[in-house]
Design a protein with these regions (language model features):
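Short, ligand-facing micro-motifs at secondary-structure edges
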Residues: 3-29, 46, 50, 59-65, ...
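Generic, well-ordered alpha-helical scaffold segments in large soluble proteins
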Residues: 4-7, 51, 55, 99-106, ...
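A short glycine-rich beta-alpha junction/loop motif
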Residues: 26-34, 43, 68-87
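Short, conserved charged micro-motifs
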Residues: 42-47, 94
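Glutamine-centric residue-chemistry signal
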Residues: 58, 72, 77, 93-94
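Amphipathic alpha-helical coiled-coil/heptad-repeat segments
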Residues: 82-112
């Protein structure tokens, strides 16, 4: 359940976050990727992924990007540490994740 965030690359692929469930064998992270470990008793990784992927949080992610060309931008780990993420109680985090998953499930049905 670790979180991975791209911290460098093309503008549209920087700041992308995912949850890695399990422990993949022979995984080596690029220096352009940040791994977030967290306190499992307080944080649902899927909630963090959902929250950081939201349009409101993406505003802060894009604002933290530096670089002259859209083909190569960066977000420093120091900037990432300044992101403010609302952190409701764990049961509320799970409720939000469940609700968002239901909505995405409905969207997937419409697309296929």
């Amino acid at each position: 359940g670790d979180l991975l965030i791209t911290r460098a690359g093309p503008r549209n692929r920087t700041g992308v976050i995912c949850v890695v469930d399990g422990e993949p064998e022979n995984l080596i992270l690029s220096d352009k990727t940040v791994r977030l470990s967290y306190l499992r008793n307080f944080v649902n990784p899927h909630y963090v992924m959902t929250a950081l992927s939201s349009p409101a949080m993406q505003y802060f992610v894009v604002d933290a990007m530096t670089g002259m060309a859209a083909s190569q931008v960066n977000i420093s780990q120091e900037k990432m540490k300044t992101f403010f993420l609302p952190l409701p109680p764990l049961n509320e985090q799970q409720r939000i994740v469940d609700e968002v998953s239901k909505i995405f499930g409905r969207i997937d049905k419409l697309n296929f």
